[in-house]
């Protein structure tokens, strides 16, 4: 869980920008999108092997 405390003399826009940066670095949004729908184990394995193949030939 990302937590951002608004500092003294810091605008809300700056705090929001800092919060968005921490959330994107932690990968929370990607994790939520990945878990949004159920994925069969066979599909997970297929995606994992395709990603490994892409990394290998890149």
Curated annotation (Swiss-Prot):
PROSITE patterns, alphabetized: RIBOSOMAL_S21
Q: Which Gene3D superfamilies match?
A: Ribosomal protein S8
Its BP terms in the Gene Ontology are: translation
- At the top level of its lineage, which domain of life is listed? Bacteria
Q: Quick one: signal sequence residues? A: none
Q: Which UniProt keywords apply?
A: Ribonucleoprotein, Ribosomal protein
InterPro entries associated with the record: Ribosomal_bS21, Ribosomal_bS21_CS, Ribosomal_bS21_sf
One MF term from GO for this chain?
structural constituent of ribosome
Q: Name one GO cellular component term.
A: ribosome
**Membrane spanning segments where?**
none
Instruction: Kindly give the Pfam families that the UniProt entry links to this protein.
Output: Ribosomal_S21
- Family of the protein in this entry: Belongs to the bacterial ribosomal protein bS21 family.
Protein's name according to its UniProt entry: Small ribosomal subunit protein bS21
Which gene produces this protein? Answer: rpsU
């Amino acid at each position: 869980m990302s937590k951002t405390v608004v500092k003294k003399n810091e605008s809300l826009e700056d705090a929001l920008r800092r919060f968005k940066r921490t959330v994107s670095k932690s990968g929370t949004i990607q994790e939520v999108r990945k878990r949004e729908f159920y994925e069969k184990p066979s599909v997970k394995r297929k995606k994992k092997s395709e990603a490994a193949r892409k990394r290998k030939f890149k």
